[in-house]
Amino acid sequence: MERIRDDTMKKKLIGLALSAAMLFSVLSVPAFAAVPEESADPALTTEQTAAEEENCFFTSSSTEEEKEPNSITYVALGDSICAGIGLTTVQYAHNLMGVDVSFNFKGYPETCYVGQVGKSLNLDRDHAINLGLPGVMSKDMLELVKTGTMAEMNTLSGCQYNYPEFVDYIKSADIISIQLGSNDAFVPTVVSFGEATNWKSEDLASIVLSGNLRGSSKETEDALNESLKKLSLTRSEKDAVWNLFFSGMNKICENAYPESSSNLRQIVATVKELNPDAQILIIGATNPVPLLPSWSNYFSKLNNYEKQLADVYGATYVSIPFAQTELDGHPTVSGHKYIADKIVKAIEAQQ
């Protein structure tokens, strides 16, 4: 009975997280729009559907001459951004989200930034490992890099990962990237959103989970509009949502920063201790909702802290201010390519 309750809670939290991402999209703009336009990469401004974008990637890839695989090993630690969630080619079972995504460690989509870094460095799937975990918060990753297991379920995100091989992956890597911190603010916001609306999100969550939102079909658009109509809120629920977005988030972000910065420091220190010879890259964050001052302030402080952290531990900070994101808050294929290019440049600069 306890197992059933846990599974139900996980599904509710994961579904709500995706639903809340849609609500945030009302306030979202492409991440690179918040910075000077002349600095933006023109390649990222081309409008394409997700399928067209990924098809272009695979078409261009097939014409290149094959090279001998490199012998170095790249390991990426991160959350759903790292995992490639949102890409049309990502493979995962919804009932295993937050529980077991080990199939994505080597079976990740070629278009995610881990896949594109691997391609640029001529790494096969045994030498480019994607340890991106959807829903993971910095405190969860700290447990995983130390012991390979989460002692208990994260009741906010609904995830509980257990991978004893985590430590071995870190020890065997030549290059390790760390991309974390977004969920420390996002997950508590999601839970607060659910409480404010009395969890009226089932239909919307179903559409988001289908993966069709990155397409452009009228059928998906109509279904989305219908689900939004069903998300009818009472006056008190509307007031609660309003208070969340315009005051509650300030407190959430203020509380998130001390924890995320402390956990990130311990994660980097632990990784450094496990593998002192590895090149460590700390990947900055892109704010998917720059119109919310509380989030902009959180990500600004987090990025500044990560720069300092990199200096202290002899790591490399990789800034990604122009990473294009979709309505679900995750990078597009172009966004992943941009992140990958920045990572590859950082790696090559140290060689």
Stretches found by the model and what they are:
Residues 19-26:
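Bacterial N-terminal signal peptides
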